[in-house]
Amino acid sequence: MEGEERFHYGIDIGAAAGTEIGCFADGTVTAVGESSSYGKYITVAHEGGYSTLYAHCSRIIASSGASVKEGDVIAEVGETGVATGPHLHFELHEGSQYLNPIYYVSLA
């Protein structure tokens, strides 16, 4: 919320609305939904107890239960939920622990 400091899990990656979002790694889509804060989101379970969350999407392409491969387009960038502009909010989890995605992804 504006004026309130909170720990921010994950990273925000600015991109034009409608930009395709590729899956981080092979996995299975475990949830597709919408919340007031995340807007439209999708979560994917990966081998080894890892999972990823992609939020503020304008459109979700993959469906719950689908098997996806690294790089598959699973959604599109948007600004749904609490967002000040179009971007991808990306989280990486190991079990219930939040990991800093910056150590695991290349933004190049």
Question: What is the predicted function of each stretch?
Answer:
Residues 1-108:
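Catalytic cores of peptidoglycan-degrading enzymes
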